[in-house]
């Protein structure tokens, strides 16, 4: 989730807005094949994005920390991870700086950017790239459909294309 901390309107002249945000999330992964649905892994991320907007153009610069941790139930079922001192083989920890540039003239948005990872454990190639398009037709209504396609490429995987297609309903400006 992203929360705005402070916004400057017309900071560099009329229509130039700058905002500092904080973002955080936790993603739990459960073993649904077990009767107790044990927590296998939990991923955390904490970031400090700065967003600049002028008319239809926006830019997000962000420092982000990401980490993944094994769940207690998983380690209890696999004690060899702890006894063989292999815990660091399963931990993922990195920081990144990313920049994403966006153009949103009306009911569609196109974006693209890059990320550079640093302080990475385990060590890996540092560069990533993202781009995509989002469509929100009929966005003048409080409830409307949205769809998009997101592409993610990583140097670590020889720039193989990873893509995600999204469809949903957006609710905004609800009249109460």
Regions found by a protein language model. Give the residues of each.
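N-terminal low-complexity, intrinsically disordered segments
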Residues: 2-4
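Short loop/turn motifs that connect adjacent beta-strands in outer-membrane beta-barrel proteins
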Residues: 6-20, 56, 104-108, 135-146, ...
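Outer-membrane pore/translocation modules
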Residues: 13-132
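Outer membrane beta-barrel transmembrane domains
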Residues: 120-176
